[in-house]
Amino acid sequence: MATPETRRRPNILVTGSPGTGKSTLGQQVAEKLGFVFIEVSKEVRENNLQGDFDEQYNCHVLDEDKLLDHISDRLDSDEGGIVVDYHGCDLFPERWFDVVVVLRCPTEKLYDRLQSRGYSEFKIKENVECEIFGTLLEEARESYSEDIVHELQSETTEQMEENLERICELAGEFKNEHTMEQ
């Protein structure tokens, strides 16, 4: 079982409310660093890792145990180099991630993005409230060591480019620190 001390490359979690740019940024980070990208929603759909259908949210409920079993070998590897995109973080073991990025977005912009995706008013309201209260940032800070949690703004193209560079810097810092220790 890998730990940050034994991993050669960092595992990175990109989290935030739906519509903050997690998938876009996660994929860009993985491509730029030559890492593997795991888009949890896609893994769930393609590997039947969901439970019952939730009528209120108009989606299937994630079977967390199935998901964790499905991805654990990759995230427990000493090689590292995995970027995971998911809108939550408290279900993942703390040992899996070396960098946790929480994307934030102004609520007006988030509302527009979710509306353009066809989200119901109920789902939009839930996600906007989550963003207003900083629920996912708080969850990340409670689930992981605060020194690996990074809050980044994700409203503009320029911010997305800056976020890509910042995450690549963090990955480089991890690699440098762990190369010196070994």
From Swiss-Prot:
Give any single GO term for biological process. rRNA processing
UniProt-annotated stretches for the region LID: 116-126
Provide the residue span(s) of the region labelled Disordered.
1-20
The catalytic activity, as recorded, is:
AMP + ATP = 2 ADP; ATP + H2O = ADP + phosphate + H(+)
Which stretches does the entry tag as region NMPbind? 39-62
- What are the UniProt keywords, alphabetically? ATP-binding, Cytoplasm, Kinase, Nucleotide-binding, Nucleus, Ribosome biogenesis, rRNA processing, Transferase
A Pfam family that the UniProt record links to this protein:
AAA_18
Molecular function per GO: adenylate kinase activity; ATP binding; ATP hydrolysis activity
Gene disruption: observed consequences: Suppresses worm growth.
What parts of the sequence cross the membrane? none
Would you identify the family this protein belongs to, as annotated? Belongs to the adenylate kinase family. AK6 subfamily.
Query: What name goes with this protein?
Result: Adenylate kinase isoenzyme 6 homolog
Query: In which organism is this protein found?
Result: Caenorhabditis elegans
